[in-house]
Amino acid sequence: MNTIHEESNIKLGGGLDDVWLNTQTGQLHIVDYKSTSQKTEGKQITLDDQWKAGYKRQMDMYVWVMRRKGFNVSSTGYFLYCDGDRFSEHEFLNAEDAVMHFKMSLIPYETTTDWIEPTLLSIRDCLSLEHTPDHSEACEFGVFLSLVSNPKGKA
C-alpha cells in the first residue's frame, strides 16, 4: 500500500496490519499490532515512551496514504498491544511446556498528517544537496557512523 507524492517524487507506503470498518460512521480505522515483552506489571501501556514516536509517525503516514488513495479514513487509529508477561509469577518455562501470558491493550491514537508533505519536501531538498548534512547529536545512526569511522578517537 503506497502512493507517490508528485511534488517530491517520493514513493511512501508500508504494510498495514489491519483495517477496521466503523459500521456507524462508514469510516475506516487503521490498526497496528505491536508485540513486546516489557516489565509492565501494574502499569498501563501507553505511547508516551520516546522510542514509540516512530509508531505514531507510522500511523500518521498510513492514514495519509489511505486518504490519498480515496478511502474515508478516521483520524483515530488504534494500536493493539500484545505484551508478553514473562516477568510475573506465572512460570514461563518448565519441564513439560512453555507458556506465556499476554496482556492485551487497545490504545486509541489521534493522528496528525499535516507534517507529512513538508517533511517529504524537506527530504527531497536534503537528497538534492551536494554534501550530506551533519547528523544531529541525538541521531543514533550518526553516533554509530562516527564510532565506526573513527574508532577510539583516532584521527
Where are these regions (language model features)?
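Metal-dependent nuclease catalytic regions and adjoining charged, substrate-binding loops involved
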Residues: V65-A155
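An active-site-proximal "capping" alpha-helix that borders the catalytic cofactor pocket
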Residues: G54-R67
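Long, contiguous hydrophobic alpha-helical segments, chiefly transmembrane helices and signal peptides
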Residues: Y33, M59-M61, G77
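A residue-level signal for conserved active-site and pocket-lining positions in enzyme catalytic cores
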Residues: D18, Y62, G142
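Catalytic cores of nuclease domains that cleave nucleic-acid phosphodiester backbones
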Residues: M1-Q44, V73
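Short, charged/polar micro-motifs that form catalytic or ligand-binding hotspots
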Residues: D48-K56, L129-T132
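Short histidine-centered catalytic/ligand-binding loop motif
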Residues: K39-A53, F102-I107
